[in-house]
Amino acid sequence: MTITDLVLILFIAALLAYALYDQFIMPRRNGPTLLSIALLRRGRIDSVIFVGLVAILIYNNVTSHGAQMTTWLLSALALMGFYIFWIRTPRIIFKQRGFFFANVWIEYNRIKEMNLSEDGVLVMQLEQRRLLIRVRNIDDLEKIYKLLIENQ
């Protein structure tokens, strides 16, 4: 096994750990989930570039008769990238004392002000940071509003 294979295994393990944390562990942290809302995906161009570069590496490894193990590991990396970028949906998860946004726990008392833009983006101003929450379904904004009113 080469150093390349070890690095690929490390990246695959990291992506798998992230996917498991995001899908199974994070919703169970910090109490029961009160509301889970699907968000819009960010630009997919980065994911297209990543999967495209991995596909080029697979092609290069196959045409140069590289190690078959490396080809399988590159294929697994491409599949993990495909899952994380295209199948998994980003979510905002509301709990009793706060919420998870982009895998970061934010308590409700950190919210200094909230606004709704004309194009349906909920803007939450924290102490030093602004969160732009783009929901997939515009009706979910009302659910978020009701939940925040009940918990504040």
From Swiss-Prot:
<dbReference type="GO" id="GO:0005886">
    <property type="term" value="C:plasma membrane"/>
</dbReference>
<feature type="topological domain" description="Periplasmic">
    <location>
        <begin position="1"/>
        <end position="5"/>
    </location>
</feature>
<feature type="topological domain" description="Periplasmic">
    <location>
        <position position="66"/>
    </location>
</feature>
<protein>
    <recommendedName>
        <fullName>UPF0266 membrane protein YobD</fullName>
    </recommendedName>
</protein>
<feature type="topological domain" description="Cytoplasmic">
    <location>
        <begin position="27"/>
        <end position="44"/>
    </location>
</feature>
<keyword id="KW-1133">Transmembrane helix</keyword>
<keyword id="KW-0997">Cell inner membrane</keyword>
<keyword id="KW-0472">Membrane</keyword>
<keyword id="KW-0812">Transmembrane</keyword>
<dbReference type="InterPro" id="IPR009328">
    <property type="entry name" value="DUF986"/>
</dbReference>
<feature type="topological domain" description="Cytoplasmic">
    <location>
        <begin position="88"/>
        <end position="152"/>
    </location>
</feature>
<comment type="similarity">
    <text>Belongs to the UPF0266 family.</text>
</comment>
<keyword id="KW-1003">Cell membrane</keyword>
<dbReference type="Pfam" id="PF06173">
    <property type="entry name" value="DUF986"/>
</dbReference>
<feature type="transmembrane region" description="Helical">
    <location>
        <begin position="6"/>
        <end position="26"/>
    </location>
</feature>
<feature type="transmembrane region" description="Helical">
    <location>
        <begin position="67"/>
        <end position="87"/>
    </location>
</feature>
<feature type="transmembrane region" description="Helical">
    <location>
        <begin position="45"/>
        <end position="65"/>
    </location>
</feature>
